[in-house]
């Protein structure tokens, strides 16, 4: 049997190490499974470890040194990689984000999405949540003012009556679709707005502005309990100081609600099915029952009858229902996982190429072996980083392992094989490759992913939940902090720098 070429052997060993790194994720998951809520630690600290390794890999190992000969390749390539990463991140969130409806109102009575949410958890700030938080009540709906242009008595409205009456005097709803709406073909209520366009009443002296819904909910159990909204006040900012209570920012409260990841995943899958089966002729009815997830992860559907309170006010035609697209833990991890697998797979092609090029002759034997040793730890950590986001976000865990095995385990040998066919029959000094631009693009891509991982790990960690009735030991086991995420990030940096000792 002919001896296996050194470059092929090194490539196969690197692939096996990548797959072993991927298998560490389910093993650690089983180890943490015996402790309640401790799997969130694996996600938070694992993302931080991967972030440190990726940031160091991008800036220290991949990014070429800027010299006079390549200065017009390195920086443009880095910039292109960063832009591509942001664009791909935007596309993923466009398809996987939650759509939240905000409804315009005068502020005289409860406004908002009319959500009926239930929660038995409270945030890390140790504020307890009411088990039944209603942002509007039946009394408000029954006594809604007649200026809305619809029946004011609940007895006069049956289930068969139209929710929106044909009133020629009522201004038409402004419909402005965003790029996200166009990409996903979603038919959401009103205009797509940025969260910053919801001007809080506490920061505005102009009464025509609408508070970011809902108003403050007063709870007998907590100092503050507002699971849904950004800022605002129940009394247009005129109540006493003791009634001025901050509102949890809905974007951060939803985006880092890792504990209820399964609900956001279920919401995403059900909404995909809903939008695919929706036809233009029944759009008028479907848009009034917009499904989304509450900030605390409860699966919520708007009450269609409550949307009678969202009509235009004749005195202010500029106010209209609108919606926001919010990132969720599902969309964040899905985006990170897709980008990580894509970039690391592309990154392993030049790695395999380099392994072949430095091991093709006896003269470069020592250099090729040192590069192989430096890539051992590197490949192990990369396998872990590729698997963790998908393993967390997918319901079928074996899919995450399979993706890493195919992309991570197969890309490096494939890159070495491509190098073999390119340089077959040439002398070692012929056709020396210049991959500065390709490495710069990959470095820019990897840099953004690493920063996203670190941001997400800290957000998940600082936004974790404690539960009523937990003992001191349970709270200690489920507790995680951003400071510990920083330590794990530094550990990832040291792992990559330690691998450079062999070069």
From Swiss-Prot:
GO terms for biological process: intracellular zinc ion homeostasis; zinc ion transmembrane transport; zinc ion transport. One of its GO terms (cellular component) is endoplasmic reticulum. Residues 115-126 have a biased composition (Basic residues). Its main location: membrane. Pfam families: Zip. Keywords: Ion transport, Membrane, Phosphoprotein, Transmembrane, Transmembrane helix, Transport, Vacuole, Zinc, Zinc transport. Residues 112-171, 221-244, 274-295 are annotated as: Disordered. Residues 127-142 have a biased composition (Basic and acidic residues). It is a multi-pass membrane protein. InterPro entries: ZIP (IPR003689). It comes from the Eukaryota. One of its GO terms (molecular function) is zinc ion transmembrane transporter activity. It is found in: Vacuole membrane. The modification Phosphoserine is found at residues 178, 188. The keyword Zinc applies. The chain crosses the membrane at residues 8-28, 42-62, 75-95, 336-356, 371-391, 398-418, 438-458, 482-502. Residues 280-295 have a biased composition (Polar residues). Belongs to the ZIP transporter (TC 2.A.5) family. Transports zinc from storage in the vacuole to the cytoplasm. This is Zinc-regulated transporter 3. It comes from Saccharomyces cerevisiae (strain ATCC 204508 / S288c) (Baker's yeast). The gene is ZRT3.
């Amino acid at each position: 049997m002919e001896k296996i070429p050194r470059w092929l052997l090194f490539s196969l060993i690197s692939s096996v190490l990548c797959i072993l790194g991927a298998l560490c994720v389910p093993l650690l998951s089983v180890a943490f499974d015996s402790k309640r809520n401790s799997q969130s630690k694996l996600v938070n600290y694992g993302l931080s470890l991967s972030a440190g390794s990726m940031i160091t890999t991008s800036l220290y190992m991949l990014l070429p040194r800027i010299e006079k000969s390549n200065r017009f390749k390195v920086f443009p390539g880095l910039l292109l990689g960063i832009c591509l990463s942001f664009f791909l991140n935007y596309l993923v969130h466009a398809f996987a984000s939650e759509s939240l409806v905000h409804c315009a109102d005068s502020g005289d009575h409860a406004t908002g999405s009319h959500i009926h949410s239930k929660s038995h958890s409270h945030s890390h700030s140790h504020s307890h949540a009411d088990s039944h938080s209603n942002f509007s009540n039946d009394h408000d709906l029954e006594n809604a003012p007649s200026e809305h242009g619809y029946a004011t008595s609940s007895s006069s409205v049956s289930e068969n009556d139209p929710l929106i009456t044909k009133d020629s005097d009522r201004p038409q709803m402004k419909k402005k679709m965003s790029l996200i709406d166009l990409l996903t073909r979603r038919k959401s209520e009103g205009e797509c707005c940025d969260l910053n366009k919801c001007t809080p009443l506490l920061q505005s002296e102009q009464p025509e502005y609408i508070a970011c819904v809902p108003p403050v909910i007063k709870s007998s159990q907590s100092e503050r309990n507002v699971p849904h909204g950004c800022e605002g006040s129940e009394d247009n900012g005129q109540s006493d100081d003791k009634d001025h209570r901050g509102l949890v920012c809905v974007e951060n409260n939803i985006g880092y609600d890792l504990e209820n990841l399964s609900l956001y995943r279920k919401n995403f899958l059900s909404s995909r099915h809903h939008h695919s089966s929706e036809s233009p002729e029944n759009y008028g009815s479907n848009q009034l029952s917009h499904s989304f997830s509450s900030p605390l992860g409860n699966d919520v559907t708007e009450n269609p009858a409550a949307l009678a309170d969202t009509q235009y006010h004749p005195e202010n035609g500029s106010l209209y229902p609108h919606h926001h697209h919010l990132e969720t833990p599902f969309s964040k991890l899905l985006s990170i996982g897709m980008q990580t697998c894509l970039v690391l797979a592309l990154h392993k092609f030049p790695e395999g190429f380099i392994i072949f090029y430095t091991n093709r002759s006896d003269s470069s034997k020592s250099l090729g072996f040192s590069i192989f040793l430096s890539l051992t730890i590197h490949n192990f950590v990369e396998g872990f980083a590729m698997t963790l986001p998908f393993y967390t976000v997918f319901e079928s865990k074996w899919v995450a392992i399979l993706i890493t095995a195919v992309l991570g385990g197969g890309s490096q040998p494939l890159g070495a094989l491509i190098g073999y066919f390119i340089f077959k029959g040439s002398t070692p000094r012929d056709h020396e490759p210049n991959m500065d631009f390709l490495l710069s693009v990959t470095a820019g891509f990897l840099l953004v992913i690493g920063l996203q991982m670190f941001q997400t790990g800290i957000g998940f960690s600082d936004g974790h939940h404690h539960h009523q009735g937990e003992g001191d030991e349970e709270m200690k086991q489920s507790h995680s902090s951003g400071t510990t995420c920083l330590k794990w990030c530094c550990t990832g940096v040291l792992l990559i720098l330690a691998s450079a000792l062999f070069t």
